[in-house]
From Swiss-Prot:
Species name: Haloferax volcanii (strain ATCC 29605 / DSM 3757 / JCM 8879 / NBRC 14742 / NCIMB 2012 / VKM B-1768 / DS2)
Associated pathway: Cell surface structure biogenesis; S-layer biogenesis
SUPFAM superfamilies reported for this sequence: S-adenosyl-L-methionine-dependent methyltransferases
Similarity field: Belongs to the FkbM methyltransferase family.
Pfam families: Methyltransf_21
Name of encoding gene: aglP
Effect of gene knockout: Mutants exhibit defective or limited motility.
Function: Involved in the assembly of a N-linked pentasaccharide that decorates the S-layer glycoprotein and flagellins. S-adenosyl-L-methionine-dependent methyltransferase that modifies the hexuronic acid found at position 4 of the pentasaccharide.
Protein name listed in UniProt: Hexuronic acid methyltransferase AglP
GO molecular function, one term: methyltransferase activity
Predominant location category: cytoplasm
Gene3D superfamilies reported for this sequence: Vaccinia Virus protein VP39
Enzyme Commission code: 2.1.1.-
């Protein structure tokens, strides 16, 4: 961490502790806003600049129709979910218990409907090892054979078949390397999807993601969205 970032971190920590930064904070994208409680410097930073996620949220807002069902897979503390709830009914998936608690608190403040679900979506149901970030808002939790935590996984298709969640129209996936397993577990659900955006992490070939989305009859593109990471976007073309 650079000296500048250390100073900024200390400044925000002091502001949080002294009440100079008040909770809730407001985050806004394209005129759509939501309020978020903040309990750490990391959450202040995440809400203040959305960690470079503005373009992702903007796309979700542009593509979602009123009252669509949006799956936010890898929701973290709920920035995307809460802002997008102004247009869509959001089902927010977050397996980390600490982060899930923060997601739930923010969902209660959301301007629209956000249903928090403490599941890790995958290709099948079961238990897997999971390595949480030491700080809830960091968003660097990941599946790992050496993980210190066990989480429950379930496939998206199984959730739909059980009636617990409706089929999605819009999907956002940000799962730190588990992207392919998430998509393999929702091959049926993808048939109803009009728009999906998948953030690509280390170890995942974006071409493998485009292949799965193409099988669901979605047209695909790989883009950067002004970020270092690749994103795969899938859209259903109107006949």
């Amino acid at each position: 961490m650079t000296i500048v970032k250390k100073v900024a971190r200390l400044r925000d920590w002091i502001a949080l502790k002294t009440g100079a930064i008040r909770s809730p904070m407001i985050a806004e994208v394209s005129g759509y806003a939501a309020r978020f409680t903040v309990q750490s410097v990391e959450e202040i930073w995440r809400i203040r600049d959305l960690r470079g996620e503005q373009d992702v949220i903007r796309l979700l807002l542009e593509e979602a129709e009123e009252d669509d069902v949006l799956w936010d897979v890898g929701s973290n503390i709920g920035t995307h979910a809460c802002i997008c709830s102004t247009k869509a009914n959001v089902f927010a998936f977050e397996p980390n218990p600490d982060t899930f608690d923060r997601l739930t608190e923010n969902s209660d403040r959301a301007p629209g409907t956000v249903i928090p679900l403490r599941y890790g979506l995958s290709s099948s149901s079961g238990d897997i090892s999971f390595e949480p970030s030491p700080i809830a808002a960091n968003g660097t939790h990941k599946v790992s054979t050496e993980g210190s935590m066990t989480i429950k996984t379930i496939s998206g298709d199984e959730l739909v078949e059980s009636g617990e969640v409706p089929k999605p129209n819009v999907v956002k996936v940000d799962v730190e390397g588990h992207e392919l397993e998430v998509l393999k577990g929702m091959t049926n659900a993808l048939q109803s999807v009009n728009f999906v955006i998948v953030e690509i992490h280390a170890g995942v070939d974006p071409k493998d993601v485009t292949k799965l989305l193409s099988e669901a009859k979605l047209s695909t593109e790989i883009t950067k969205l002004n970020r270092d990471e690749d994103f795969v976007i899938g859209r259903r073309q109107n006949d």
